Amino acid sequence: MKYQTLSGLLALSLLFGCSSSPDVVPDVPPSQLYSEAQTALQSGTWLTAIEKLEALDSRYPFGAYSEQVQLDLIYAYYKNDDLALGLATIERFTRLNPTHEKMDWVLYMRGLTHMAQDRNFMHDLFNIDRRDRDPEPVKAAFADFKKLLQRYPNSPYAEDAQRRMFALKNRLAEYDLATADFYLRREAWIAAINRTQELQKTYPDTEAARKSLEIQLEAYQQLGLTDAIERTKQLMQLNPL
């Protein structure tokens, strides 16, 4: 909840305080401004597209292009890595248009945007392992894609959402594994066992669940729990890495 509150405040401050000013965009008819925004979107000049779309949104909030402008902003913000602005626009659109025909796409984009929050360019560039970083954006993305599948099972975005959920599940399982390993290294044996048990229950079909048996075994050995040791060894034989 703290994560959602802070991110929401940040998004609102960005949306109303830091977005590009419509004053820099010439005062032209909305049809011309919309056409220029579409040209910028098609050419991938995201910042230009955003400036023109924001100007349209500000000057003509109830105009003929208002809904499509918001949808285009959602996409442009995502492509430009303006993720907080993207999420704020998604929430606004969802609140104003809960039954819109493109709500499946909006849910899909919310999932993609939350996934993008989990990315870190420097970590990807230098291949730094950050399995222990905050998983809240991943949980949010998983929930978005799950909601998409539940509400719109025949959506053209459903298949890709399902594939992404599989990857997100592995990411969450790796986080729990890293947490269990942290407890093990701190000699917090019970905490390590509890975390591995939770991992195995929640994500039983992941590699992280199989790896967690090694942590569980060591913790049981440190506690001298003979029956639990034997049971874990049997599970390791049945679930080899």
UniProtKB/Swiss-Prot annotation:
Keyword check for Membrane, yes or no: yes
General function of this protein: Part of the outer membrane protein assembly complex, which is involved in assembly and insertion of beta-barrel proteins into the outer membrane.
The protein depicted here goes by the name Outer membrane protein assembly factor BamD
Query: Does the keyword RNA-binding feature in the UniProt annotation?
Result: no
State the organism of origin.
Answer: Vibrio cholerae serotype O1 (strain ATCC 39315 / El Tor Inaba N16961)
- Topological relation to the membrane, as annotated: Lipid-anchor
Under Pfam families, the record lists: YfiO (PF13525)
Query: For this UniProt entry, which residues form the secretion signal?
Result: 1-17
What are the entry keywords? Answer: Cell outer membrane, Lipoprotein, Membrane, Palmitate, Signal
